[in-house]
C-alpha cells in the first residue's frame, strides 16, 4: 500500500523514499498478539509445584531449560544456551529469562538476531509448563516478518558526519578509519553485539604484504594477489577498486594487532603457490572469534569518540533530492524508528544469505542452506536501489568447503558442518551424479576448489549425489581417501589435507543418514530407484569403463582419481548446496561510491563488503580467504574515499 511516514521532529525538507520489504528479526506484531493471548492462557493454569526440565533443538546445540513452579506461578528459570553461537544465541539466556518471568508465559518476543535459539528456549519452557500443569501448552514462535508497517513514525534523530551500517568485516574497518581521522561516526549493527557478523567468526582473510607474512618469510606481493584475483575474474570486476583493496592488507593487520588481536598465517591449502590467507590464532593457537575478535576494535572506535549502537536495522535511505543524507533504522528491541542524519552513509550489511526469496531469485527454487548467520537479508542492497543505485552483474555464493549437507539433517546453520562423516564424500573426488543419475561435472573441481568452482557446479543441479561402493566405503573409513586412491603424489589437496583423515564414525553416521532419508544402501538398482536416478546404472557402467581405460573422456578428471565402483552393495548420498556467504550486489565506481543508471556516483552513498557487487567475481575467487580479505580491505578503501570527499565538500 501507499507508504506514509510520520516524523516526531521536523525533517527540514528532507524526504524519505519508498519503503522496501525486509526480513525483520523477531518480535512481529503477530508474535506480540500471540504473547498476550498466551499470557492469558498461562494465567489460568495451575501447576504441580516443583522443578521440571526440557530441551529443544537450537541452531548449534540442544538448548536446555530448568523451570521451577509454585502452584500458580513460574518462579525461576535456568537456561543453558552455552552451546549456541557465541555472540548471538549463546548470549540470550538472561534476556529470555527476564522476558518469560515478566510475562509468565513461554510465548514472548525473542531476542533480535537469535530467532532460532529464542524459539528453542520458548519451546523447551512450553514443555516444562505442560509437564507441570498436565495441560498441553503450545508456544508462539517468532517468524520473519516480510514488511515494515505502512506508517513509520520516526521518534528521534541523531546527527553525525558519517553513518556506517553493519558491524561486519567492512563496517568495523571503515568505522575505525573514519573515527581515527576525526570524522564523527555512528556504527549501526542489526544484531545484539559486535560478534554476530560473518566477519567476526570466519576463518581468515587473504591479504598481501603484511607483517605476518614478512615474519615467516612468506610475503605475498600485491601484484601476485591482484593478478590471481583479477585474472580469475576475467575483468568482470572493477579492477581499480580491487587493486586498492588488495593494497590495504597491512592496514587490516594493523587494526587488529595494534589493538591486541593477534594474527597468524595459514598454510597453502589448495595449491595456489602462495600463502595469502591469515588467521586469528592467539598466542596459544586458539582461533579468536565473535566478540573476542571485534570488541577490542569497537573499544578503540568508541575511545576515539565513535558511537556504536546495536539492535539497529537500517530500513531506508534519507534523501535530499538525489543525495543520500542519512538512513532510517529500526530499534528491533523497542520497535521504534530512528533517523540518522549524516553527510556520508556506508552500506556494509553482509549480503543476502538470510533471504530465501533472493536466493531463489538468482539461483532458482533449490535449497541453499546458510551456514552463517542469517541476519544479512539483502536490506542493504534494497536501500541502495531505493536511493537510485543499480545492480552489478556478478551473483555468486561462497560454498561449503567441508563437504555436503542436506535439509533432512536435524542440524541447522554452522552445526551442519562435518556433523556426519557421510558428508565428506561430497569432496572426495569420487563419482557424483545429478538428479537424473548423470555425471554433471569434473568431480575434482569439487575436491580441489570447493569454495568456488565445485560449489558453483552444485548450484546448477540443486541436489547432487555421491556414489560409493563397499570398497570405497570401508577404505575411506579405515584407511582414508588418500589411501583409497593409492596415495597419488600429484593430488596436492589430497596429499596435504587428507594424510591423516579417517571416518571413524561412518557406520553410525550412515545409519542416521539412511534413517533420515538422505542416504540409501543396497544394490545399485535399489539406490537408483530410491532417489529416482534413472540413468545411474548406465552412468556407473560408463564411469567404470573410463576408469579401466585410465582416461575420462567426458570431463577429463585426472586419472589418479579414477577408480571403478563394483560389487553388490552401494551407498548413494544426497547433498544440497550450503554456503558461508553471498556475493552479488550494487554497482560502485572505483571509489566505492554507489552509482546510478547513468553510471554517476550517488552523492553521500558508499558500499563495501559483499554488498558491493563490483569487487567480487562469479564464481567466487579460487584463492581461499578472498571473500573475507576483500570485505575487510574494502571497508578501509571506502573510508578513505569518504574522508576525502568530506574534506573536499
Give the predicted meaning of each segment.
Residues 1-13, 17-21:
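N-terminal secretory signal peptides and thylakoid transit peptides that target proteins
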Residues 44-142:
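Active-site- and interface-proximal helix/loop "cap" or "latch" segments in soluble metabolic
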Residues 78, 316, 534-619:
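A glycine-rich dinucleotide-binding beta-alpha-beta segment and adjacent secondary-structure elements
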Residues 152-168:
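Beta1/beta-strand and adjacent pyrophosphate-binding region of the FAD-binding site
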Residues 158-160, 335-344:
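Core beta-strand elements of the Rossmann-like FAD/NAD(P) dinucleotide-binding domain
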Residues 247-336, 356-357, 404, 547-567:
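Conserved redox-cofactor binding core of oxidoreductases
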Residues 340-408, 628, 637:
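Glycine-rich loop(s) and the adjacent beta-strand/alpha-helix scaffold that form part
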Residues 381-383, 390-530:
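An anion/pyrophosphate-binding glycine-rich loop and adjacent beta-alpha core
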Amino acid at each position: 500500500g501507499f507508504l506514509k511516514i510520520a516524523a516526531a521532529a521536523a525533517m527540514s525538507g528532507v524526504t524519505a523514499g519508498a519503503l522496501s520489504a525486509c526480513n525483520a528479526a523477531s518480535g512481529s506484531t503477530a508474535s506480540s498478539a500471540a504473547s498476550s493471548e498466551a499470557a492469558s492462557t498461562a494465567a489460568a493454569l495451575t501447576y504441580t509445584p516443583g522443578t521440571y526440565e526440557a530441551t529443544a533443538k537450537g541452531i548449534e546445540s540442544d538448548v536446555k531449560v530448568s523451570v521451577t513452579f509454585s502452584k500458580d506461578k513460574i518462579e525461576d528459570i535456568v537456561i543453558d544456551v552455552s552451546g549456541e553461537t557465541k555472540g548471538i544465541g549463546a548470549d540470550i539466556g538472561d534476556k529470555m529469562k527476564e522476558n518469560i518471568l515478566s510475562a509468565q508465559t513461554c510465548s514472548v518476543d525473542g531476542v533480535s538476531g537469535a530467532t532460532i535459539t529464542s524459539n528453542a528456549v520458548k519451546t523447551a519452557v512450553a514443555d516444562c509448563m505442560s509437564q507441570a500443569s498436565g495441560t498441553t501448552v503450545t508456544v508462539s514462535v517468532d517468524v520473519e516478518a516480510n514488511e515494515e508497517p505502512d506508517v513509520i513514525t520516526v521518534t528521534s534523530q541523531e546527527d553525525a558526519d558519517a553513518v556506517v551500517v553493519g558491524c561486519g568485516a567492512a563496517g568495523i574497518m571503515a568505522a575505525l578509519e573514519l573515527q581515527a581521522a576525526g570524522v564523527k561516526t555512528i556504527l549501526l549493527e542489526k544484531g545484539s553485539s559486535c560478534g554476530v557478523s560473518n566477519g567476526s567468526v570466519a576463518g581468515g582473510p587473504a591479504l598481501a604484504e603484511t607483517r605476518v607474512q614478512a615474519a615467516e618469510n612468506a610475503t605475498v606481493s600485491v601484484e601476485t594477489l591482484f593478478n590471481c584475483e583479477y585474472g580469475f575474474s576475467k575483468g568482470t570486476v572493477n579492477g581499480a577498486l580491487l587493486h586498492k583493496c588488495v593494497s590495504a592488507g597491512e592496514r587490516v593487520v594493523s587494526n587488529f594487532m595494534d589493538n591486541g588481536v593477534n594474527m597468524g598465517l595459514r598454510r597453502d591449502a589448495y595449491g595456489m603457490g602462495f600463502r595469502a590467507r591469515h588467521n586469528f590464532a592467539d598466542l596459544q593457537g586458539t582461533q579468536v572469534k565473535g566478540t573476542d575478535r571485534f570488541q577490542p576494535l569497537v573499544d578503540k572506535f568508541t575511545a576515539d569518540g565513535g558511537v556504536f549502537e546495536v539492535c539497529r536495522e537500517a530500513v531506508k535511505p534519507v534523501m535530499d533530492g538525489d543525495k543520500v543524507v542519512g538512513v532510517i533504522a529500526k530499534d528491533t528491541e523497542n520497535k521504534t524508528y530512528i533517523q540518522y542524519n549524516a553527510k556520508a552513509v556506508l552500506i556494509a550489511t553482509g549480503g543476502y544469505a538470510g533471504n530465501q526469496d533472493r536466493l531463489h531469485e538468482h539461483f532458482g527454487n533449490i535449497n541453499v542452506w546458510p551456514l552463517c548467520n542469517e541476519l544479512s537479508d539483502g536490506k542493504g542492497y534494497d536501500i541502495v536501489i531505493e536511493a537510485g543505485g543499480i545492480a552489478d552483474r556478478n551473483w555468486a555464493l561462497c560454498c561449503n568447503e567441508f563437504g555436503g549437507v542436506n535439509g533432512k539433517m536435524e542440524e541447522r546453520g554452522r552445526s551442519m558442518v562435518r556433523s556426519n562423516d557421510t558428508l565428506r564424500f561430497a569432496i572426495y573426488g569420487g563419482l557424483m551424479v545429478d538428479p537424473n543419475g548423470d555425471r554433471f561435472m569434473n568431480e575434482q573441481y569439487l575436491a580441489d576448489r570447493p569454495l568456488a568452482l565445485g560449489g558453483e557446479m552444485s548450484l546448477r543441479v540443486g541436489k547432487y549425489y555421491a556414489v560409493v561402493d563397499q570398497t570405497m566405503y570401508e577404505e575411506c573409513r579405515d584407511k582414508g581417501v588418500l589411501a583409497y586412491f593409492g596415495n597419488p603424489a600429484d593430488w596436492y589437496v589430497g596429499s596435504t589435507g587428507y594424510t591423516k583423515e579417517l571416518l571413524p564414525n561412518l557406520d553410525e553416521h550412515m545409519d542416521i543418514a539412511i534413517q533420515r532419508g538422505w542416504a540409501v544402501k543396497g544394490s545399485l538398482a535399489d539406490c537408483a530407484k530410491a532417489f529416482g536416478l534413472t540413468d545411474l546404472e548406465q552412468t556407473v557402467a560408463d564411469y567404470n569403463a573410463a576408469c579401466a581405460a585410465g582416461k575420462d573422456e567426458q570431463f577429463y578428471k585426472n586419472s589418479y582419481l579414477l577408480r571403478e565402483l563394483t560389487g553388490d552393495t552401494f551407498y548413494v548420498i544426497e547433498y544440497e548446496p550450503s554456503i558461508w556467504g553471498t556475493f552479488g550486489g550494487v554497482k560502485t565506481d572505483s571509489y566505492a561510491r554507489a552509482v546510478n543508471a547513468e553510471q554517476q556516483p550517488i552523492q553521500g552513498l558508499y558500499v563495501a563488503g559483499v554488498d558491493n557487487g563490483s569487487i567480487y567475481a562469479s564464481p567466487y575467487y579460487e584463492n581461499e580467504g578472498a571473500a573475507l580479505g576483500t570485505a575487510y580491505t574494502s571497508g578501509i578503501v571506502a573510508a578513505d574515499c569518504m574522508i576525502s570527499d568530506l574534506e573536499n565538500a
